[in-house]
Regions:
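Long, highly charged, low-complexity intrinsically disordered interaction regions
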Residues: 129-188
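Acidic, metal-coordinating catalytic segment for phosphate/diphosphate chemistry
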Residues: 20, 326-442
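Catalytic palm subdomain of template-directed nucleic-acid polymerases
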Residues: 114-135, 208
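Residues that scaffold, gate, or flank divalent-cation-dependent active/transport sites
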Residues: 1-109, 113, 238
Length: 442
């Protein structure tokens, strides 16, 4: 097989969180009616996953609890994020019995890409046969069902998974460039395709483009004018082309130099209560910098205010989540430090100053983000020292932070708490019991 003749698998664990909860209860993930959602939250809470049996009844993934028809009997499982991470790691271990880690890209907790090109002769099978073998092994060891897409590049493997396998009785999909054009050039909607969201679909529609076939045949100049360099990706994907390969992914190093913490508050917070949360978040970001051996050149805060019913209705009328986020009234600011720092005192003081200077005192608050910018390694060369800083005091504070980080790493994030964490409006203790904003289950 030539270096240009590749075979990729894209494997997705079906309704992963819901499947894990079914297996934990000794139930069949494919036939059990189950949703993963926190019953302690309101009926507006989002279902993190719904089982295939619920999907068959028309219940869409990521719906809100109140949207589930009342005549459907189902199990509501409280999220257990730590368990899902553990099961995902178990399944990754199954993958490693077939492929080396350099040939696996973990796309998300429930989805991976695999370059199986060099393994087909080793195992004496086709890409589909290897995919079937891996999928059957995962099911046998963990009880979790999976779908699989196969293609000669990462994009076609992903589309084979997302579109073709979804409509296949055996949950397998396989595409090459020719079958992609033959079967999917007229497929609608465009949002079914990887990397095309509602916003891009609307912009393409204004250009008279509603299918991948129309996109492939469209003149390129207007596309580049509208989308800039991203037009190249759209055009390539319209033709089923993807130049990025597994080795490119493995060689990629992020150029991001920031560290952030954000949260959506469970209720509308007044100015004083939100300041408490901002202080907690400042403490958390400072400790994360120490844990990672990093320094920040700046710190910033963004506050999103609560939206009125009228504002939400106007955003929905404009259409799309992007329009909704654009409509959120907000404020914030940034402070640069004399030299990069991870001092808890400096970061805490800066956040309080920014909050007091920039945040409206009369408008309820619902969202907050604290971001450390210009992040560098502690030992990086060329760092300009702050000649006016008290070095001995900073060293003492740094040692305390390292000790706190060590205790939390061993005994959990709630092992060391400050007085502010015990205030009724504080969110830190609850967030410490969460993974990705949802209950960890531990």
């Amino acid at each position: 097989m030539s270096t240009d003749d590749r075979q990729y698998l894209c494997i997705d664990l079906k309704s992963f969180y819901a499947s894990v909860e079914c297996v934990e209860r000794g139930l069949d993930p494919m036939t059990t009616r189950l949703v993963v959602a926190d019953p302690e939250r309101s009926d507006k809470t989002i279902c993190l996953a719904v089982s295939p049996a619920m999907k068959a009844l028309g219940v869409r993934n990521r719906c809100r609890v109140f949207e589930i028809p009342p005549d459907i009997d189902y199990i509501m499982a409280t999220p257990r994020m730590a368990l899902y991470v553990e099961r995902s790691a178990d399944i990754y271990g199954v993958y490693l019995t077939y492929l080396a880690p350099e040939d696996i890209h973990v796309y998300s907790i429930d989805e991976v890409f695999m370059d199986v090109t060099d393994y087909l002769s080793l195992y004496g099978c086709t890409a589909r046969e290897l995919g079937e073998r891996i999928r059957a092994d995962v099911l046998a060891r963990t009880g979790i069902p999976a779908s699989c897409g196969i293609g000669p590049n990462l994009y076609l493997a992903k589309i084979a998974l997302d579109i073709t396998a979804k409509h296949s009785p055996d949950f397998f999909g396989e595409l090459d460039e020719e079958s992609y054009k033959a079967t999917l050039w007229n497929h609608r909607p465009l949002t079914d395709f990887w990397r095309i969201g509602e916003g891009i679909q609307r912009r393409l529609a204004l250009m008279g483009i509603h299918t991948m076939g129309e996109l492939a045949m469209a003149p390129e100049e207007p596309l580049y004018k509208e989308f800039g360099i991203d037009a190249e990706i759209l055009i390539d994907h319209a033709w089923g082309i993807e130049p990025v390969r597994m080795e490119h992914i493995k060689a990629y190093r992020s150029e991001s130099h920031s560290l952030s913490s954000g949260q959506v508050l469970m209720r509308d917070y007044n100015y004083s209560d939100a300041l408490t949360v901002a202080k907690e978040m400042a403490d958390g970001v400072a400790l994360d910098l120490v844990r990672q051996g990093k320094l920040a050149a700046s710190i910033s805060i963004w506050v999103g205010y609560a939206m009125t019913a009228e504002m939400r209705a106007a955003a929905r009328e404009e259409g799309g989540m992007r329009a909704w986020y654009r409509s959120i009234p907000s404020s914030g600011g940034t402070k640069r430090f004399p030299s990069p720092t991870n001092s808890r005192e400096a970061i805490y003081r800066a956040i309080v100053e920014l909050f007091e200077a920039d945040v409206d005192r009369d408008t309820p608050i619902r969202r907050m983000t604290v971001n450390a910018g210009g992040v560098v390694d502690e030992g990086a060369s060329g760092i300009q020292l702050d000649l006016f800083a008290d070095g001995e005091r900073l060293d003492s504070e740094h040692r305390r932070q390292e000790a706190v980080a060590a205790v939390k790493a061993r005994f959990g994030n709630n092992a060391v708490l400050k007085g502010i964490d015990l205030l009724p409006e504080a969110t830190g203790r609850e967030r410490n019991r969460q993974i990705g904003g949802h209950k960890s289950g531990v």
